A protein has these predicted regions:
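Juxta-kinase regulatory segment immediately upstream of eukaryotic protein kinase catalytic domains
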Residues: 1-20
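A short beta-turn/loop motif at secondary-structure boundaries
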Residues: 22-26, 77-80
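Active-site acidic catalytic loop and adjacent metal/ATP-binding pocket
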Residues: 25-36, 43, 164-209
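A conserved alpha-helical element in kinase catalytic cores
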Residues: 40-80, 92-112, 209, 218
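Hydrophobic residues embedded in beta-strands of well-ordered beta-sheets
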Residues: 41, 82-84, 194
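Short pocket-lining segment of the protein kinase catalytic domain that shapes the ATP-binding cleft
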Residues: 84-91
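A cross-family kinase active-site recognition segment
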Residues: 93-155, 173-175, 203-204
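Helix-rich C-terminal or lid/interface subdomains of diverse kinases
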Residues: 204, 212-284
Length: 284
């Protein structure tokens, strides 16, 4: 069954037009905008390869738990396929570029998220951090990181113990809602609201993590420097984020996401020098 056919099945309304969505994001999920016979348009995505299947199935489970001005309307979900259908955001503004107005909107988003209690049923940030791994993965096998050219072996010999120690102190406790995958292709602006998409990694924890995941991508896209956007970062959170990218940037690409490693190398090249500076280490 095709994705438009799944939309018809779930909504009980004929699809009279279909526009595939390509580009953006890092997964190979099937995506598109359906024009419905009742005049509505909706965005739908389907997981059909490893990685996207688990991500969309997870999002189908999490999405009904979510509420807030930053959550697009859920139209339908079928975790068995899996298929997710939400409101169409084609007319929204998707950064970059980053204007002062968009950056101000992003600050409002951070405040909204920090004020939002995570719904019951979300995984914990502490569990997600343990499951994902960061510098401990590099300590077990530093080879992939060294192939990126971002660090030398000598620098890693000197810095790795401090990075492992710092990430162990990262604050994970908390009951706030975290998106945990904030970057420009996962958010848009419309009618004074910031709307977040791709909620499959949402957790309950300390809200400082979302800001630090987001701000380095703004610098990468020509926006302000990370030190302007987060002048007082938590050293442990920053160390863990750098370690997350360090452990993955040199690995083969996962199935269905051929471009993600290049992006992670670019992220590492911004976050690791920042983390090193905050921790008083030499520049990699």
């Amino acid at each position: 069954m095709s994705l438009p056919e799944h939309v018809e099945r779930l909504l009980g309304v004929p699809v009279v037009g279909w526009r595939p969505v390509v580009g953006g994001g890092w997964s190979a999920s099937v995506r598109g905008v359906a024009e419905l016979a009742d005049g509505r348009s909706v965005f739908a995505k389907l997981g059909d390869v490893p990685g996207t299947i688990e991500a969309i199935r997870g999002e189908c489970a999490i999405y009904p738990l979510l509420s807030g001005p930053f959550v697009p309307e859920l139209v339908a979900a079928d975790p068995a396929v899996p298929v997710l259908v939400v409101e169409d955001l084609s007319d929204a503004t998707w950064p970059p570029p980053w204007s002062p107005e968009l950056l101000a909107g992003l600050e409002r988003l951070f405040a909204e998220l920090a004020a939002t209690r995570a719904p019951a049923g979300l995984p914990s940030l502490a569990g997600r951090v343990r499951q994902a791994g960061a510098w401990e993965l590099v300590a077990a096998d530093r080879g992939p990181l060294l192939t990126t050219g971002v660090v030398s072996e000598g620098w890693l010999d000197h810095a790795l113990p401090a990075l492992v120690e710092a990430q162990a102190a990262a604050p994970t406790a908390g009951d706030r809602l975290l998106h945990f995958d904030l970057r420009s292709d996962n958010l848009c602006f419309r009618d004074g609201r910031v709307l977040l998409v791709d909620w499959n990694l949402a957790v309950a924890g300390d809200p400082r993590w979302d800001r630090l995941f987001m701000v380095h991508t703004i610098q990468m896209e020509g926006g302000p420097n990370v030190r302007e956007l987060a002048p007082d970062p938590d050293p442990g959170v920053l160390a863990w984020i750098a370690g997350f990218f360090a452990a993955r940037a040199g690995m083969p690409p996962p199935v269905g996401a051929p471009r993600v490693r290049g992006f992670q190398r670019a992220q590492l090249a911004v976050v690791l020098p920042w983390a090193a500076d905050v921790l008083g280490l030499s520049t990699p």
